[in-house]
Curated annotation (Swiss-Prot):
It comes from Candida glabrata (strain ATCC 2001 / BCRC 20586 / JCM 3761 / NBRC 0622 / NRRL Y-65 / CBS 138) (Yeast). Thiamine diphosphate binds at T390, G413, S414, I415, G445, S446, N471, D472, G473, Y474, T475, I476. GO terms for biological process: aromatic amino acid family catabolic process to alcohol via Ehrlich pathway; pyruvate metabolic process. Homotetramer. CDD domains: TPP_PDC_IPDC (cd02005), TPP_PYR_PDC_IPDC_like (cd07038). Its cofactor is Mg(2+); thiamine diphosphate. The gene is PDC1. This is Pyruvate decarboxylase.
């Protein structure tokens, strides 16, 4: 085979970088492209219920596998995906957005085609995507098309940001040399400037030598930019107390003896707040300092000795070193750390979150008790997905087992995101290890935005746990403003009718309302095997919420009300 179609070239390249599942919807400008998926062994087309859900699914898949691909059609399809793509941009998730666009000749003639604005402007939607993409490409020349595809895939992976790739309908069947596939896409980072890297490492080593009470704080980009291994080695080598932010959940081993808890500024447990804020050196890995990730910017460090390791720069106190990538800098730092910590005497880490006290099994479920108890259900390697709202805050008090991965859209916060993300994560988990469990916690209100994607889970035989927290509406919004306002009410659904309604045959339904019912279900051996899709409706009081969310809601309401 000396030549292959451009469409097949795209999917062969994605297959080479371990993207096996493609998300999206068919439309007449991408149909010929979609044909080529079935020509590549091991590739599959998920086929989503709508483009927004497809974007969410691509995000969830990419968080587990490193990058993903969504395919939409020109105009109506691509615009429906943009909320999800914007979330991936905000949260550093590598999603390749491929858009099937009208033929080059149709564009040149400015034909009044369907899915256009009727004004002959065929670049308007491309321009809309530009501000939420790391880079964009509109392929117009078959000779350079393979190189453009390679560039887009590399950029998606390296930067962990969305990339837009427009493919005209008339080009995807044209042939390109198959030999090009023999040279793998280079997914490696370019080395740091040696002088700048050495200055960074030497400066950090001096700070470490002088520190008596240093801490390590792991955040979102420790996972997104692939430095989890380096961060673990840093903790092991230094024995410094180590903490995560809400967006950093799962980035380090929470069962490690030097793990101290989740730091969220004023919303932290008092002992965690004291441990972090009294440190004389803070090594911050992959920080993403958003409001809900910092307790509304309530970090209150006493020290000025703060080192921020980022994907493309490092900041030490007030000095910034642009272009110095944390992955290589951490690796070089690790080589010299043993000598630098010779004088360090480990300080105690905060005590673990205490277990729930025994109570009457008939006690009605409440959020504080439930989130403490969730940790007993979790297993090593689980993917834990928590929706914006009570779930995203409650999970902060749930210790993760080793190698668990947390997914929560703390920065972008688009409600309903996690249903689609659960689908994508379930595909990814199945590809990595069919025994790997995917567990979703979502509110009844959020579920109503994206519930259709459960049907896609059923269609593909995926087996996630779907915990629906039924607290009769938008509790997080009620806490911020409008406790009894009608706009925070929703229609009550029969959640246990959803799986059979969507055509499930092998499934389980459960409803739990008491502590005894929760324990009986989550401790059941068969229930703990991911052998089928499960819907678990969790009955909770309307205004019940984790303490941290109640406090965050007060902070948010105060900020929203400020006049200047």
């Amino acid at each position: 085979m000396s030549e292959i179609t451009l469409g097949r070239y795209l999917f062969e390249r994605l297959n080479q970088v371990d993207v096996k599942t493609i998300f999206g919807l068919p439309g007449d400008f991408n149909l010929s492209l979609l044909d080529k998926i079935y020509e590549v062994e091991g590739m599959r087309w998920a086929g989503n219920a709508n483009e927004l859900n497809a974007a969410y699914a691509a995000d969830g898949y990419a968080r587990i596998k490193g990058m993903s691909c969504i395919i939409t059609t020109f105009g109506v399809g691509e615009l429906s995906a943009l909320n999800g793509i914007a979330g991936s941009y905000a949260e550093h998730v590598g999603v390749l957005h491929v858009v099937g666009v009208p033929s080059i000749s149709s564009q040149a003639k400015q034909l009044l085609l369907h899915h256009t604005l009727g004004n002959g402007d065929f670049t308007v939607f491309h321009r809309m995507s530009a501000n939420i993409s790391e880079t964009t490409a509109m392929v117009t020349d078959i000779a350079t098309a393979p190189a453009e595809i390679d560039r887009c895939i590399r950029t998606t992976y390296i930067t962990q940001r969305p990339v837009y790739l427009g493919l005209p309908a008339n080009l995807v069947d044209l042939k390109v040399p198959a030999k090009l596939l023999e040279t793998p896409i280079d997914l490696s980072l370019k080395p740091n400037d040696p002088e700048a890297e050495t200055e960074v490492v030497d400066t950090v080593l001096e700070l470490i030598k002088a520190a008596k009470n240093p801490v390590i704080l792991a955040d979102a980009c420790a996972s997104r930019h692939d430095v989890k291994a380096e961060t673990k080695k840093l903790i092991d080598a230094t024995q410094f107390p180590s903490f995560v932010t809400p967006m950093g959940k799962g980035s380090i081993d929470e069962q490690h003896p030097r793990f101290g808890g989740v730091y969220v500024g004023t919303l932290s447990r008092p002992e965690v707040k004291e441990a972090v804020e009294s440190a004389d050196l803070i090594l911050s890995v992959g920080a993403l300092l958003s409001d809900f990730n910092t307790g509304s910017f309530s970090y209150s460090y006493k020290t000025k000795n703060i080192v921020e390791f980022h994907s493309d720069y490092i900041k030490i106190r007030n000095a910034t070193f642009p272009g110095v990538q944390m992955k290589f800098a951490l690796q070089k730092l690790l080589n010299a750390v043993p000598e630098a910590i010779k004088g360090y005497k480990p300080v105690p880490v905060p005590a673990r979150v205490p277990e729930n006290k025994s109570c009457d099994p008939a006690t009605p479920l409440k959020q504080e008790w439930m989130w403490n108890q969730v940790s007993k259900f979790l297993q090593e390697g689980d993917v834990v997905i928590t929706e914006t709202g009570t779930s995203a805050f409650g999970i902060n008090q749930t210790p993760f087992p080793n190698n668990a991965y947390g997914i929560s859209q703390v920065l972008w916060g688009s409600i309903g995101f996690t249903t689609g993300a659960c689908l994508g994560a379930a595909f990814a988990a199945e590809e990595i290890d069919p025994k790997k469990r995917v567990i979703l916690f979502i509110g009844d209100g959020s579920l109503q935005l994206t519930v259709q994607e459960i049907s896609t889970m059923i269609r593909w035989g995926l087996k996630p746990y779907l915990f629906v927290l039924n607290n009769d509406g938008y509790t997080i919004e009620r806490l911020i403003h409008g406790e009894k306002a009608g706009y925070n009410d929703i229609q009550n659904w029969d959640h246990l009718a959803l799986l059979p309604t969507f055509g499930a045959k092998d499934y389980e339904n459960h409803r739990v309302a008491t502590t005894g019912e929760w324990d009986k279900l989550t401790q059941d051996k068969e229930f703990n095997k991911n052998s089928k899709i499960r819907m678990i409706e969790v009955m909770l009081p309307v205004m019940d919420a984790p303490t941290s969310l109640i406090e965050q809601a007060k902070l948010t309401a105060s900020i929203n009300a400020k006049q200047e």
